[in-house]
């Protein structure tokens, strides 16, 4: 497969603090954000004209699932198909604890299985709580950042008002890393749209050495 501008993992929290209605808002919000014209143009408008995207669901230390495998996006039709899969994804992992470190390890494995080189690799960690299970996030975060991967965060504050500080300290890392927040899942789609626009705008700056 030809190289791409961006490899992007959407990693969504499915822990017990996320109700099934909230999960539907989160998945649907991701689908809506992906369909934004600026996001669509960014994913397909880089120097190489394509991106790879995947969806990972996570909760406890032993609960991660790749819900949508790596999908090459080079046309609006490709993106629409991926957005539909994301919006309609079933909740494949149990509503358990919050194991951010284990989720990052799963993202690390997913990036290792990339079907093509990517100029930029980004993980979107989406959650509504601090890590309370499994390995601590920092070792996996540091390994990923050391490999040139950017980990960004989107914090939903309805459970923990100061979650952004925790994500800033323990989760986000890598070139250009940032975290955004939204108050609850009703504002999730707009927050994700802004986040994707910001991430994709950086995709034209290569940070991964391709062989």
PLM region spans:
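Acidic, low-complexity intrinsically disordered regions
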Residues: 1-211
């Amino acid at each position: 497969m030809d190289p791409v501008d961006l490899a992007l993992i959407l990693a969504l929290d499915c822990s017990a603090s996320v109700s099934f209605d909230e999960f539907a808002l989160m998945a649907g919000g991701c689908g809506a954000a992906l369909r934004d014209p600026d996001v669509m143009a960014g994913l397909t408008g880089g120097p190489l004209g394509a991106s790879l995207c995947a969806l990972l669901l996570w909760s406890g230390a032993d609960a991660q699932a790749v819900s949508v495998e790596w999908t090459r996006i080079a046309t609006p039709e490709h993106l629409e198909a991926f957005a539909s899969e994301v919006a309609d994804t079933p909740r494949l992992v149990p509503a358990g604890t919050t194991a951010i470190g284990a989720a990052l390890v799963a993202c690390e494995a997913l990036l290792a299985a990339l079907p093509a080189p990517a100029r930029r690799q980004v993980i979107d960690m989406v959650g509504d709580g601090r890590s309370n299970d499994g390995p601590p996030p920092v070792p996996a975060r540091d390994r990923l950042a050391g490999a040139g991967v950017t980990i960004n965060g989107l914090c939903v504050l309805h459970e923990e008002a100061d979650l952004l500080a925790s994500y800033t300290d323990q989760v986000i890392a890598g070139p250009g890393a940032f975290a955004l927040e939204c108050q609850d899942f009703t504002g999730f789609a707009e927050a994700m749209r802004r986040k994707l626009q910001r991430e994709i705008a950086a995709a034209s700056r290569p940070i991964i050495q391709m062989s």
